[in-house]
């Protein structure tokens, strides 16, 4: 048990109110919930909060597309998100929204304090403006040709093909993603948060030793490259909070989003009588932890603590970042049926299965977690059903049938029970350090010992022999005592299953009760705590996800056909001479190997045979070919004399030709039978 109760405030990153919760989101919420449940079992006062991130251009545009107000869209999203989290037994004390009176008041208050303290600057900037929609375009709402490698259909902030970063104004032939119009440059006054002013404070913070090493190392890289002032304003039209003392300026979503943590807690305080300042004042003794994904470390380790410090508020005790979820070793994919929504999963499987699997693979490092669907079935059946649940089922029946549900008055194997209970300190340390995989391994090792005890004693043999009733009761009672200890250890991970165990044991399983075995105690008849997984259940989830994707594509194509003119043929480029064409050395190449680049949303890595040598080429066709291995063995056309380009993932030694508008609409060029690797295209 803990020496004294701690006051702890825990948050998860705020899901964006513009889409469904999927299994990638759930990794973080399950991870945090397990940690919170453990802390509560140890007697600490934990307040677990979250909210929907409900502002920004994407929400405004999607609402317009759906013909509803942004308020209606975010209300619908919040209801869906709350239902999904409740379905997975995420034990939030409060789930709020950034589009709330509390958040609006806190955001304005903090902005005014930062401004008064000299940390808000203003200057005029030039931005791309959509003349048809009458709006400034965020980076991700502009597409065009990369100014570095000339790859088409690239976003306004970075190129997925060559990994270059640039400003939207550098794009060649830019176009608005919103309307398709050619944007124009327009000046506007913007407000900036003076992040460089906090460099000294942030450097001292990372030296405190409380942050994950990966985060501290990454922050050091950012310091070396130089901190920049942060644009915290957006121009109308924009769905968000208006900046005080302005007519048409709004807070950038990432300014008010983290303040949403405070707003959700303020909402909880108003409902329960908690003291808000006790948790947020500069000298607060309460602990504050943020569970986040690795993609938003920048905001939580730089901007957020700097904003808090600039307002004379406390900084987080720690920021816990995790990696992404992959499925079967690759990025989640809608077309493959692995981009699984929470609601789809819950229609087919119990939430405890995913909670257990994630826990079994989680550690305290920033590593991606692979959900291997075949391993998922095997592990759940082997661990939860065969080892844990079966330990109770093979013992409880004898107690209820032969002894009126009464456990023995004494412990048959005191030393064995003591061995199980003594593991509590180590398991508690693993929980505290978020080493959930180690918790699961430790518990399953104990489960193996408990099942070996049953196998060695063979109560089914005792039950057939006269005069061994007392021994039978003692052995089966001992097995249930061991099961009870394991159930206490697993309660933060699989609370729903353990609730059923508590019902049949007629005992509330607490960490404190580890040293209080159930002696001469009555139990109820055993009922199945968990069902075996059938691979067909996984197939059903995957198939339903694929069907959702097909239906979504059909709807988008239907809407696109209504909105777009019939002709989508690109105009012919300027005339070139035969000499210009002759400069290109086009060759036929055979695909020897093709694989996805995990760090990129668009790139595939090809190993090509050009007859007398092999080459590595990266191509941005990942969306069009989501099963790269199927390309192996086919022929493609390559620009062979293109200068090699060094990329973040390696050197690309050519360019593979394809036709189409980009994204999923790309098609590799085929060659007739009889061609050989290295043949020149003329």
Curated annotation (Swiss-Prot):
EC class of the enzyme, as a word: ligase
Q: Which keywords accompany this UniProt record?
A: Aminoacyl-tRNA synthetase, ATP-binding, Cytoplasm, Ligase, Metal-binding, Nucleotide-binding, Protein biosynthesis, RNA-binding, tRNA-binding, Zinc
Q: Could you tell me which Gene3D superfamilies the record lists for this protein?
A: HUPs, Isoleucyl-tRNA Synthetase, Domain 1, Methionyl-tRNA synthetase, Zn-domain, Nucleic acid-binding proteins
Q: Which residues bind Zn(2+)?
A: 146, 149, 159, 162
Cofactor binding: number and manner = Binds 1 zinc ion per subunit.
Give residue numbers for sequence motif 'KMSKS' region.
Answer: 331-335
Q: Which reaction does it catalyse?
A: tRNA(Met) + L-methionine + ATP = L-methionyl-tRNA(Met) + AMP + diphosphate
Gene Ontology MF term list: ATP binding; metal ion binding; methionine-tRNA ligase activity; tRNA binding
Residues binding ATP, per UniProt: 334
Cofactor(s) the record lists? Zn(2+)
Q: Can you give the residue ranges of the tRNA-binding domain?
A: 580-682
Role: Is required not only for elongation of protein synthesis but also for the initiation of all mRNA translation through initiator tRNA(fMet) aminoacylation.
Known partners and oligomeric status:
Homodimer.
Under which name does UniProt file this protein? Methionine--tRNA ligase
Q: Which gene encodes it?
A: metG
């Amino acid at each position: 048990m803990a020496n004294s109760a701690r006051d702890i405030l825990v948050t998860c990153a705020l899901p964006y109110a513009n889409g469904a919760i999927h299994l990638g989101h759930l990794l973080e919420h399950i991870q945090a919930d397990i940690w919170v449940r453990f802390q509560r079992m140890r007697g600490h006062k934990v307040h677990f909060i979250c909210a929907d991130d409900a502002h920004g251009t994407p929400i405004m545009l999607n609402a317009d597309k759906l013909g509803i107000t942004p308020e209606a869209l975010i209300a619908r999203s919040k209801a869906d998100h709350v239902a999904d989290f409740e379905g997975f037994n995420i034990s939030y004390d409060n789930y709020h929204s950034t589009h709330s009176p509390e958040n609006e008041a806190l955001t304005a208050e903090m902005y005014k304090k930062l401004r008064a303290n000299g940390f808000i600057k203003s200057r005029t900037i030039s931005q791309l403006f959509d003349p048809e929609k009458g709006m400034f375009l965020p980076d991700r709402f502009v597409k065009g040709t990369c100014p570095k490698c000339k790859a088409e259909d690239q976003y306004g902030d970075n190129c997925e093909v060559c990994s270059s970063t640039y400003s939207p104004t550098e794009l060649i032939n830019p176009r608005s993603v919103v309307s398709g119009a050619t944007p124009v440059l327009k000046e506007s006054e913007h407000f900036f948060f003076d992040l460089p002013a906090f460099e000294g404070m942030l450097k001292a913070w990372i030296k405190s030793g409380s942050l994950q090493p990966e985060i501290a190392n990454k922050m050091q890289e950012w310091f070396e490259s130089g901190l920049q002032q942060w644009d915290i304003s957006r121009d109308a039209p924009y769905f968000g909070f208006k900046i005080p003392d302005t007519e048409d300026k709004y807070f950038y979503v990432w300014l008010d989003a983290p303040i949403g943590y405070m707003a959700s807690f303020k909402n909880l305080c108003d409902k329960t009588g908690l003291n808000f300042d006790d948790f947020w004042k500069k000298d607060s003794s309460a602990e504050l932890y943020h569970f986040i994904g690795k993609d938003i470390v920048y905001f939580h380790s730089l901007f957020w603590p700097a904003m808090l410090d600039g307002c004379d508020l406390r900084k987080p005790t720690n920021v816990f970042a995790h990696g992404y979820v992959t499925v079967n070793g690759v990025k989640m994919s809608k077309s493959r049926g692995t981009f699984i929504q929470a609601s789809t999963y819950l229609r087919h499987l119990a939430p405890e299965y995913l909670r257990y699997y994630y826990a079994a693979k989680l550690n305290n490092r920033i590593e991606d977690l692979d959900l291997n669907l075949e391993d998922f079935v095997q592990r759940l059946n082997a661990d939860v059903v065969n080892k844990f649940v079966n330990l109770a089922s093979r013992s409880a029946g004898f107690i209820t049938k032969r002894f009126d549900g009464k456990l023995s008055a004494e412990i048959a194997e005191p030393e064995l029970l003591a061995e199980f209970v003594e593991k509590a300190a180590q398991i508690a340390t693993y929980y505290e350090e978020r080493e959930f995989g180690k918790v699961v391994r430790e518990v399953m090792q104990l489960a193996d010992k408990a099942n070996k005890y049953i196998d060695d004693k063979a109560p089914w043999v005792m039950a057939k022999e006269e005069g061994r009733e007392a021994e039978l009761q003692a052995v089966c009672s001992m097995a249930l005592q061991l099961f009870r200890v394991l159930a206490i250890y697993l309660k933060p991970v699989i609370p729903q299953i353990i609730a059923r165990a508590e019902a049949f044991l007629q005992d509330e399983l607490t960490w404190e009760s580890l040293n209080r075995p159930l002696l001469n105690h009555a139990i109820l008849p055993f009922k199945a705590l968990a069902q075996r997984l059938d691979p067909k259940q996984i197939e059903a989830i995957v198939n339903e996800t694929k069907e959702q994707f097909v239906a979504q594509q059909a709807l988008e194509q239907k809407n696109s056909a209504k909105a777009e003119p019939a002709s989508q043929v690109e105009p012919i480029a300027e005339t070139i001479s035969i000499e210009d064409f002759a400069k290109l050395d086009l060759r036929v190449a055979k695909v020897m190997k093709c694989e996805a680049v995990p760090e990129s949303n668009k790139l595939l890595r090809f190993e090509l045979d050009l007859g007398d040598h092999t080459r590595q080429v990266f191509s941005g066709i990942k969306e069009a070919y989501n099963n790269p291995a199927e390309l192996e063995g086919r022929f493609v056309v390559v620009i062979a004399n293109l200068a090699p380009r060094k990329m973040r993932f390696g050197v690309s030694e050519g360019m593979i030709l394809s036709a189409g508008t980009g994204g999923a609409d790309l098609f590799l060029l085929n060659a007739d039978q009889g061609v050989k690797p290295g043949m020149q295209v003329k």
